[in-house]
Amino acid sequence: MSHCKFEQPRHGSLGFLPRKRASRQRGKVKAFPKDDASKPVHLTAFLGYKAGMTHIVRDLDRPGSKMHKREILEAVTIIETPPMVVVGVVGYVETPRGLRSLTTVWAEHLSEEVKRRFYKNWFKSKKKAFTKYAKKYAESTQSINRELERIKKYCSVVRVLAHTQIRKTPLAQKKAHLMEIQVNGGSVADKVEWAREHFEKTVDIKSTFEQNEMIDVIGVTRGKGNEGTTARWGTKRLPRKTHRGLRKVACIGAWHPANVQWTVARAGNAGYMHRTQLNSKIYRIGAGDDAKNASTDFDATEKRITPMGGFVRYGVVENDFVMLNGATPGPVKRVLTLRKSLLTHTSRKALEPVSLKWIDTASKFGHGRFQTPAEAKQFLGTLKKDVA
């Protein structure tokens, strides 16, 4: 005989409160990997734009698994990563209250796409940003060198200011994304010199990450607007004959205390939350100028990573890209922060070398039949539109 349960686990986690929209669209890096002076100087993060998803076929190399040495099909995410431009360096001093910035040194010339980041309305502005700062370089570089020496003398953490080249992507936005990226490896002086040498120069994705590396993806999830308690918290639907709605919380608390507790599931905003996704594996780092960046040893067809017709609602990937295992936060066109992992990975899954056998490049708009335009033309023959 069935009976009522008087105790049950609560619905939804309280660890993600407040469930409100993120303050900014770019993912914030709240912790960087631990520095190791024995390694060469390198960046610990990179910015990219989510282009879309596809799927791949590969042989699983995992002894003991039932799928060992057998083909598996996996979903992958393509993130376009044009080279980033270094435009500044920031020095941080360790204090009893944590890290505090000592000074910031900017490059002499900044492109228009990064200057737009400092204006709400670029069209109506006077566009005077960094004009006085550029005069320091014109008059004398002594003050610039003095600030760099202060960073070498007093700082323990060095981070560079780098921005994306958003004009190279299919996005309509003209305002580049700017962020601080920690520089690890070598001494503090080596880091400052590395930053100074790379002022106004580009840094590509291959100098930061490598294939088969486990990384973290930081971004803002897809926004879903206002949702009720059932969709937002996963509460149970009430019985069919319930008065005034089923997808609600029947009891929102006791008479006293005479207010609704913060732990009670309520309707409100869902999605557009800042999230950090750990342990995404890099399956491939492709070059934008390679006509065979989607070919493999088993599939020698000359094809690019962009599917036929382009990625839906994104377009054509013409720059360097990163192929990550599984899904990532956010919709297409969302800027994502790729960060080196904070952990030392020892699991077989993390250390497994990945060798791709086939990458799907069929159209993602509907059920794609062909992998390349040449394959479609060979099958369909000469069409009427080709003759006219």
UniProtKB/Swiss-Prot annotation:
Pfam families associated with the record: Ribosomal_L3
Compositional bias per record (Basic residues), positions renumbered to this chain: 18-31
Primary location group: cytoplasm
InterPro entries: L3_arc_euk (IPR045077), Ribosomal_L3_dom_3_arc_sf (IPR044892), Ribosomal_uL3 (IPR000597), Ribosomal_uL3_CS (IPR019926), Transl_B-barrel_sf (IPR009000)
The keyword Flavoprotein is annotated on this UniProt entry: no
GO terms, biological process: cytoplasmic translation; translation
SS bonds (residue pairs): none
Top-level taxon of the source organism: Eukaryota
Signal peptide positions (record): none
GO cellular component term of the entry, any: cytosolic large ribosomal subunit
Positions with biased composition (Basic and acidic residues): 1-10
Keywords: Cytoplasm, Ribonucleoprotein, Ribosomal protein
TM region(s), chain numbering: none
Locations listed in the record: Cytoplasm
Entry keyword DNA-binding: no
Region named Disordered: 1-34
Subunit composition and interactions: Component of the large ribosomal subunit (LSU). Mature yeast ribosomes consist of a small (40S) and a large (60S) subunit. The 40S small subunit contains 1 molecule of ribosomal RNA (18S rRNA) and at least 33 different proteins. The large 60S subunit contains 3 rRNA molecules (25S, 5.8S and 5S rRNA) and at least 46 different proteins. uL3 forms together with ES39L one of the contact sites for the signal recognition particle that targets ribosomes to the endoplasmic reticulum membrane.
Family: Belongs to the universal ribosomal protein uL3 family.
Protein name: Large ribosomal subunit protein uL3B
Organism: Schizosaccharomyces pombe (strain 972 / ATCC 24843)
Highest classification ranks of the organism: Eukaryota, Fungi, Dikarya, Ascomycota, Taphrinomycotina
